[in-house]
């Protein structure tokens, strides 16, 4: 198992170590590798929709996050990945406990990756099934450690 980076507060971090929405939602990375990523977040008032149940967008966020972490680890050094499509089927609601995402690759290609993500509650019941397609950016064999595409150069006249 690969030990994922963390922020000073102990929350999850992006592969470059920066804090993100993952820290705000107390996402934990339980396992991270190019063949499988398992992430978990607590279900509480922060992630509820107005009816007191888990907001579907949070399921989508966790699904794409797990797929993105795995895809970044599966990509060649120097390449980065970005989500280009996410399909999520919400199967049942959750009021409290934890939501766990288990992401595995369906296809890891040179320019496209597809990941399947199963989200479950603390009892192992299916909450959401998702599929995420990611585009692999950058030239093969580029600088090691790139996670995000480079910022555009400033426009000069």
Where in the sequence are the language-model features?
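Terminal targeting signals and extreme-terminal segments of soluble enzymes
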Residues: 1-157
């Amino acid at each position: 198992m690969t030990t994922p980076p963390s922020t000073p507060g102990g929350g999850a971090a992006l592969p470059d170590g920066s804090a993100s929405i993952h820290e705000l939602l107390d996402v934990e990375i339980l396992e991270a590798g190019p063949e499988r990523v398992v992430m978990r977040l607590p279900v509480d008032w922060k992630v509820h929709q107005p009816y007191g149940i888990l907001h579907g967008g949070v399921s989508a966020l966790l699904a794409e996050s797990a797929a993105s972490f795995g895809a970044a680890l599966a990509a060649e050094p120097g390449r980065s990945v970005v989500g280009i499509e996410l399909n999520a089927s919400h199967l049942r609601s959750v009021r409290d406990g934890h939501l766990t995402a288990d992401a595995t690759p369906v296809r890891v290609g040179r320019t496209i990756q597809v990941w399947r993500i199963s989200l479950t509650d603390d009892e192992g019941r299916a909450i959401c099934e998702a599929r995420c397609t990611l585009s692999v950016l950058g030239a093969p064999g580029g600088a090691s450690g790139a996670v995000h595409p480079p910022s555009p150069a400033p426009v000069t006249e």
